From Swiss-Prot:
The organism's taxonomic lineage, starting at the top: Bacteria, Pseudomonadati, Pseudomonadota, Gammaproteobacteria, Enterobacterales
Record-given protein name: Glutamate-1-semialdehyde 2,1-aminomutase
Reaction catalysis annotation: (S)-4-amino-5-oxopentanoate = 5-aminolevulinate
Enzyme class per UniProt: isomerase
Cell compartment(s), UniProt: Cytoplasm
Keywords attached to this entry: Cytoplasm, Isomerase, Porphyrin biosynthesis, Pyridoxal phosphate
GO MF term set: glutamate-1-semialdehyde 2,1-aminomutase activity; pyridoxal phosphate binding; transaminase activity
InterPro entries referenced in this protein's UniProt entry, alphabetically: 4pyrrol_synth_GluAld_NH2Trfase, Aminotrans_3, Aminotrans_3_PPA_site, PyrdxlP-dep_Trfase, PyrdxlP-dep_Trfase_major, PyrdxlP-dep_Trfase_small
Top-level taxonomic group: Bacteria
PROSITE patterns linked to this entry: AA_TRANSFER_CLASS_3 (PS00600)
Modification sites for N6-(pyridoxal phosphate)lysine: K265
GO CC list: cytoplasm
GO biological process, one term: protoporphyrinogen IX biosynthetic process
Organism: Escherichia coli O157:H7
Entry-linked NCBIfam families: hemL (TIGR00713), PRK00062.1 (NF000818)
């Protein structure tokens, strides 16, 4: 047995499923998950000594690559002054100044510890601000594991939500309406059915949890217009896209202004950080200045703030996003060329430093139904064969891939060459 296999066997006796987040268990592709010893730049190194070109990037945060010296040094320096104070610090102010400068729609920002905390808190704030209970989310979009968000659509887009996890009371789920991504008609129908009851729409501006599905040109502006028409708030969940699709996020890339924005992943530079913020009048409703409660023992802790501040300063440097886009475009085009040579139908979506690989005969993938029609079994084989080639992709057909500026064009070309060999065997 490999060392990963031995560790996985031991872990399953002590940790549910052997992992601390379900997708890491390889249940979406089968087999034994890799246990990682270290990471540097664009590479992961497992406990058995094998190196992999990494396109997971810790599920998004590692936009600069692993073990970036600026972030590492910032963490070490901060740790020497103490790990957590439970009191305000100068770095929290500097971090808030930087975030609000980089994302102009955020007049104010509140730091939390995860993307789930950010979305959960933003929805609570939207409900408190509007005095309404219902929310709209989209089929195939994921906004963390808060009870009101673990909801699937019923038999039709306008049916009241049904829990898709045990432990979520139906009374919670009934306030969540699930519409179809990239389908404005379904959203208008929801508003027309509940014109005075919907507090907010929450949306991934690029859906990254049904692989990678960008918005159609009119979708996000259409959501903004509907929120304005019916008096609801628009929450853009940039936990995945923030600072990755563009410096000011996908909202800037697509030219839409939300009322609230949720951030995570990159904002922490590899440490557990989330944030939410937006319009000053909305944020003023948050405790302690307003009645909507939110708190956190480790929110804004000095280690995480130092890591995030260092990361965002590096991400804001000229050329970072041009490099991300160039590398991702080259990878997408190369994979499509290699698949075409082998006669394998493939769609590769990409925006900024995100991409998604779909084995499908369809010409495009724009919604959850399109994603579900893809060949998952072929993806599973592709994943394991690429792993054997030393390429680490997301171990699920429903997760986006992530590029970093630490990837070289040689890494990209080696990945395409590996895919060409794999496609020939699929």
């Amino acid at each position: 047995m490999s060392k990963s296999e031995n560790l996985y066997s031991a872990a399953r006796e002590l940790i549910p499923g052997g992992v601390n987040s379900p997708v890491r268990a390889f249940t979406g592709v089968g087999g034994t998950p890799l246990f990682i010893e270290k990471a540097d730049g664009a590479y992961l190194y497992d406990v058995d000594g094998k190196a992999y070109i990494d396109y997971v990037g810790s599920w998004g945060p590692m936009v600069l690559g692993h073990n970036h010296p600026a972030i590492r040094n910032a963490v070490i320096e901060a740790a020497e002054r103490g790990l957590s104070f439970g009191a305000p610090t100068e770095m929290e102010v500097k971090m808030a100044q930087l975030v609000t400068e980089l994302v102009p729609t955020m007049d104010m920002v509140r730091m939390v510890n995860s993307g789930t905390e950010a979305t959960m808190s933003a929805i609570r704030l939207a409900r408190g601000f509007t005095g309404r209970d219902k929310i709209i989310k989209f089929e195939g979009c994921y906004h963390g594991h808060a009870d009101c968000l673990l909801v699937k659509a019923g038999s039709g887009a306008l049916t009241l939500g049904q829990p898709n996890s045990p432990g979520v009371p139906a009374d919670f789920a009934k306030h969540t309406l699930t519409c179809t991504y990239n389908d404005l008609a379904s959203v208008r129908a929801a508003f027309e059915q509940y014109p005075q009851e919907i507090a907010c729409i929450i949306v991934e501006p690029v859906a990254g949890n049904m692989n990678c599905v960008p918005p159609l040109p009119d979708f996000l502006p259409g959501l903004r217009a509907l929120c304005d028409e019916f008096g609801a708030l628009l929450i853009i969940d940039e936990v995945m896209t923030g600072f990755r699709v563009a410096l000011a996020g996908a909202q800037d890339y697509y030219g839409v202004e939300p009322d609230l924005t949720c951030l995570g992943k990159i904002i922490g530079g590899g440490m557990p950080v989330g944030a939410f913020g937006g319009r000053r009048d909305v944020m003023d409703a948050l405790a302690p200045t307003g009645p909507v409660y939110q708190a956190g023992t480790l929110s804004g802790n000095p280690i995480a703030m130092a890591a995030g501040f260092a990361c965002l300063n590096e991400v804001a440097q000229p050329g970072v996003h041009e490099t991300l886009d160039e590398l991702t475009t080259r990878l997408a085009e190369g994979l499509l060329e290699a698949a075409e040579e082998a006669g394998i139908p493939l769609v590769v979506n990409h925006v900024g430093g995100m991409f998604g690989i779909f084995f499908t005969d369809a010409e495009s993938v724009t919604c959850y139904q399109d994603v579900m029609a893809c060949d998952v079994e072929r993806f599973k084989r592709f994943f394991h064969m690429m792993l054997d080639e030393g390429v680490y992709l997301a171990p699920s057909a429903f997760e986006a891939g992530f590029m970093s500026v630490a990837h070289s064009m040689e890494d990209i070309n080696n990945t395409i060459d590996a895919a060409r060999r794999v496609f020939a065997k699929l």
